[in-house]
């Protein structure tokens, strides 16, 4: 029964890793790579995180509903697929290529796409799950988010910086690397999970 929920559970985990990785390490990235003072980081990145994150969370359901009205099959997964593609491209560009004067633009766009599907994960899992199993699936989702988000998110950036690149100034490479890993993996999971998700919606509605 749970095979239809697995793509959302696992795919969302990789997006959550990016979310907490960015939130934990962007201030350090701006300080080490671009030489920003902590007060500037707090003022400017704080505003970017607030507005980009809020805009992404609000926009996700709006876009999903619009795609549904256009009869797009499994619109929720389509939003997730677009998110994965965008993050795979925009993330590395932001952390490797942008100058100090334009990096916040890249971080804004990245933060927007990271938060775009967040509101859809939990509600979509509920939509395709029979009533008697919703509590179990919700528990699995919360467990997955906590383990991957709070655990792996901040840790994986530190691992690449300290153990792989072995240079604290390589945090830009570490940030780009997690996007190049998590982005394509989440894309593949969502892409191949779209059909089972669509079938689950049909079964639930019938």
Explain the meaning of each model-derived region.
Residues 12, 16, 107-111, 142, ...:
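Helical-face signature of the major facilitator-like transporter fold
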Residues 53-57, 130-165:
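A late C-terminal transmembrane helix in Major Facilitator Superfamily
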Residues 9, 42-43, 135-140, 176:
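Conserved glycine-rich helix-kink/hinge and helix-boundary motifs of the Major Facilitator Superfamily
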Residues 4-57, 114-122, 149-157:
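Extracytoplasmic gate region of multi-pass secondary transporters
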Residues 88-97, 175-206:
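Multi-pass alpha-helical transporter architecture, strongest
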Residues 56-72, 161-162:
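Helix-to-loop junctions at the C-terminal end of transmembrane segments
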Residues 37, 73-78, 159-183:
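A membrane-interface helix-boundary motif in multi-pass transporters
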